[in-house]
Regions:
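Loop-to-transmembrane helix entry/capping segments in MFS-fold secondary transporters
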Residues: 1, 23, 116, 188, ...
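Intracellular juxtamembrane helix-capping segments at the cytosolic ends
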Residues: 1, 199, 203-218
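Glycine-rich segments within core transmembrane alpha-helices of 12-TM secondary carriers
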Residues: 1-18, 24-40, 123-135, 161, ...
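Intracellular loop-helix junctions on the cytosolic face of multi-pass helical membrane proteins
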Residues: 13-118, 136-137, 141-147
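The feature captures the transmembrane alpha-helix scaffold of multi-pass secondary transporters
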Residues: 80-83, 120, 185-196
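Hydrophobic transmembrane alpha-helices of Major Facilitator Superfamily
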Residues: 91, 95, 200-207, 238
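Cytoplasmic membrane-interface "Motif A"-like loop-to-helix N-cap segments
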Residues: 143-164, 185
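Helix-loop junctions at membrane interfaces in 12-TM secondary transporters
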Residues: 170-193
């Protein structure tokens, strides 16, 4: 559902914003946010009892007061190192909404069958590729595990970051066409390839990171570390804004 929304929103808002009027585009985005809030408010009846606080059992209290073992401390260090990888990953990945979109608007030939694709439409590519490749990627990693070739979570996250980096390398082809071949605009397929590699990198990193945290984080810090992961994601987005 999230990716369906992420796919359709840039098409609708992008069309009305770029083609019709920017004020209408922003209004449509605001309407979508209000609609989401309405669904949340009226859906509360389906969430009765979920997330309500309960008194901690004696066992839970004992667990929370127990000091971390050496193994748990080592795991926390590994998690911190993985957070560094994710800062770099999200800082690069979220360039899609910044300089990559400006690059698409100014430098890429977006005319297909006589129709110029609004640059904002390309923001749908990430979600489209996730919908298209999510199941095959999950099946691949399961097959990889059955073959006895299971890789560590750190390896997968590092690999995902490298693959995502290759997505930027694909833009070298676009730069070559413009700067060396002196074409007026770069071919669109370079950007399509770049986004494809970014999503393959994301599917190798993001789901793995969430699973990695739940497995490695000590029970007393599980919720904190999950929250820290999303804070790190936000820091990566901040880095993306500073760069692009």
């Amino acid at each position: 559902g999230i990716n369906i929304g992420a796919f359709s929103a840039p098409l609708l808002v992008g069309y009305f914003g770029e083609v019709v009027d920017w004020h209408l585009g922003f209004s449509l985005a605001g309407f979508g946010m209000i609609l989401g809030q309405i669904v949340y408010v009226f859906g509360q009846k389906h969430l009765v009892g979920i997330g309500d606080s309960h008194h901690a059992s004696e066992e839970s209290k004992a667990l929370m007061s127990k000091p971390l073992s050496k193994i748990e401390k080592d795991r926390m260090i590994v998690l911190m190192l993985s957070f560094l990888i994710m800062i770099v990953f999200w800082g690069a990945y979220e360039q899609a909404g910044g300089f990559m979109n400006l690059y698409a608007k100014q430098t890429v030939d977006r005319v297909v069958f006589g129709f110029e694709i609004p640059a904002s439409f390309l923001q749908s590519l990430h979600a489209f590729y996730v919908i298209l490749l999510g199941a095959p990627m999950a099946a691949f990693w399961l097959w990889w595990k059955r073959k006895g070739l299971e890789s560590s979570a750190i390896f997968k996250m590092g690999l995902g970051t490298i693959i995502m980096g290759l997505g930027f390398m694909a833009l070298v082809g676009a730069a070559y066409e413009v700067s060396v071949l002196a074409l007026e605009k770069a071919s669109l397929y370079w950007l399509l390839l770049s986004y494809l590699l970014h999503v393959i990198g994301e599917l190798s990193s993001s789901p793995i990171a969430l699973s990695f945290i739940t497995k490695l984080a000590p029970a007393k810090y599980a919720s904190f570390m999950m929250g820290a992961y999303f804070a790190i994601t936000g820091l990566g987005n901040k880095l993306a804004g500073e760069i692009g």
